[in-house]
């Protein structure tokens, strides 16, 4: 398959192909412009993959530009986190990291140009009055009483704003467009507002800050962006994007194109709602493995490749739709099934004693991957006392149950065939120990007499077991569309985190944070980057071996 054939196809790439073929553009230049006021989530990953992927495929450029026009909500912590997320996803920006604040001097000059052209004015209505004067979708707005100030007066008042002569909220600069426009965004939008706050890049140089709609288009033009890609909620804003560039002296006029944002089942993407989850301590932070943030997904064990594959599969369209969580989970499941080494861990342990086993123990050889001999093998200790999962034993069972049953046989993974002989229980009737015998001539082979043993269970040698905490993460919400609930917090899944104390094979003591394993017959897990210690490793479940929610949704 050629490089061109391997590329995804969508309406944006078709536009780019036409622009290059017609000579409108000779190269492609995109940008990813996050606001540094929070952590990126899976929805941002779609935009990252789109913008950086296009630049990569067309051998163009993609800028990372921070839209840092509101110093009150922004922080260098978010800047660093976003840069880390972009790089972790496998992308590299062109040149240095850029900031909208790099252009504050030029933006100020363009604002003065609009004033000189009679296309901007200083308004002293309160923010509440501005909203009232703006009108509604069915009623036109009305002009501010300050709309017809002279150019000279507006220049003087704008300078007064810049030098701190007004209190916050007492004045703003507005574009003079059309208060009767059917598009509310064109009803004299605010271009500059006053904020007495220190900026993480410019310090206290400015007390007036440009609005997103004024900054965004000019920054694109100054950087030579050819295709400015936004989500659909900015569709109406394109009119203002074009109006600003049409009315200032700037040689480049990029075009904005909109695509559908990513909506994912069983989670929320709203920054306000995500913040509420964190501040009200429903989760332990922005990187909680149940969160849809990139840092949360990474901590849970999602790989960059699986997220890129997910973004590729869902595609780029103009129609809003909601993607099934199973689609994202399928991507990581396929990735880890192919690439994760296998290991054994017992999540709900019960002791099993092999009464006729002689000696201190032995080492058994296990493949690190059943289908990839190139991944090698490991030596796992075996002894006469082991841990098995409580769900792998029943005193009585029907024929469909293929695990250990009293009086019947089962195979221990890569080890021996055992037979359950009796059990020991505590005062409450709970099984504390299962007593078995083993067939010494069945190490990794069938019984010599030809009898069939169908079931296979995993195990961990008790003498060599590594005590581990296992965090069984699941979907954060119990309904597909929690955002539609009257109170989205009321539909949090009470079993989104279940903590178990178990045992793992000793090789896992060398696990490193983020390294994925398939715990055989259990699912895919990785060492937690926050809570693990050398004395007590903590493993997070990334995803189960199968979609356990499939039947729930039927």
UniProtKB/Swiss-Prot annotation:
Keywords: Aminoacyl-tRNA synthetase, ATP-binding, Cytoplasm, Ligase, Nucleotide-binding, Protein biosynthesis
Sample GO molecular function, one term: glutamine-tRNA ligase activity
A biological-process GO annotation: glutamyl-tRNA aminoacylation
Enzyme class: ligase
EC number: 6.1.1.18
Matching NCBIfam families: glnS (TIGR00440), PRK14703.1 (NF011291)
Protein name from the UniProt record: Glutamine--tRNA ligase
Source organism of the structure: Escherichia coli O157:H7
Record lineage: Bacteria, Pseudomonadati, Pseudomonadota, Gammaproteobacteria, Enterobacterales
